[in-house]
Each structure stands twice: as structure tokens, then as C-alpha cells.
């Protein structure tokens, strides 16, 4: 997505706000497709791949893949937002936000890490991001970039989450019936996860 920055900047310079927003929605949908698919893979396939490569003793509790997938997804879904924030010249909004995110991340990591271990440290990143740029940067580009209500973005974001959870529910239901070796499980789950994600999204 970083490679698209120049093209998006040129598009913004030559097109109307409506056309700009249409392109933003398209890129946001591509974000959801790619990172939603990847998040499902992390949740449902990573354990079998770890077992295959390193042994079952290195497979972590399902909470770890879940929170890793959540981190992966939330960062990925910000790609289009950050691209448009840069190309629309909205730098001055939230210029100190990254500092706040870092401070919150450290504070939450210490607090949650002591109580929940590595799960708490990974969870801290989501909390820190959720309190800062996860909502603020979309607000900036919707309000100051496209002159639209931020609710437009939020509704689509929540709808994408619903679709992702439905796909995850289907995967979780089907995968409980898959047996065999770690190699067989990995191959079958990767194929099914890809089919379900691409079919649902």
C-alpha cells in the first residue's frame, strides 16, 4: 500500500472529493480483504504450522493467536487511512498522537504484562491504539479530508467486523472436525480458510 501513495496523491490532485472518497472506499475494502484473510489464517492456521515446524510444545494458547490477529488486522485496516492522511496534507492533525500512543502502550504493557504475561503485552498494543489513532485518524480524514460524517467510516468498519466474525465462526465450526497430522491439518485449514474468507468477503 505504501507503493500506492504517489498514485493516490495524483488522484487526489486531479479528482473531486466524491471520486477521492470512492477510491478510498475501494482501498479500504482491499485492506479488509487482505488483512481479514490474514487474521483468520493467524487464528486458525498458525498453531498447526508451529506444531509442524517446531513441535506441539511450542504451540501457544489460542488467546495469543487471537490477540496477534487483532493487532495485525487493526494495523492493516489503517493503511488506506494513513495513505490518505499523508496525501491530503493532513499532517498537523494528531502530530503528537504517536507519542501518546507510545506512552499508553508502555503503561498498559507494564500493567497487563504483570497480570497476563505475553497476552497482556500484546493486548496493551490494541488498547493503546484503540484510544488514539484507531479512531482519531479516520475521524480526521473523513471530517477534514472528505467533508463527510465520521459515522460513514465507522458503520463500514463495524460491518466489516461482523463479516469477519461470521467467517471466523464458520471456520471455527468446520475446523473442529479436521483431524490427522499437523501437515494434513495445516494444508486443509489453509485451503478452507482461503475459500471461506474469499467467499464471505
Question: What positions do the PLM features span?
Answer:
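Short runs within selected transmembrane alpha-helices of multi-pass transporters and secretion channels
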Residues: 1-2, 44, 63-113, 118-144, ...
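Transmembrane helix-loop junction
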Residues: 10, 51-52, 87, 113-114, ...
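Transmembrane alpha-helical segments of multi-pass transport proteins
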Residues: 101-104, 115, 154-201
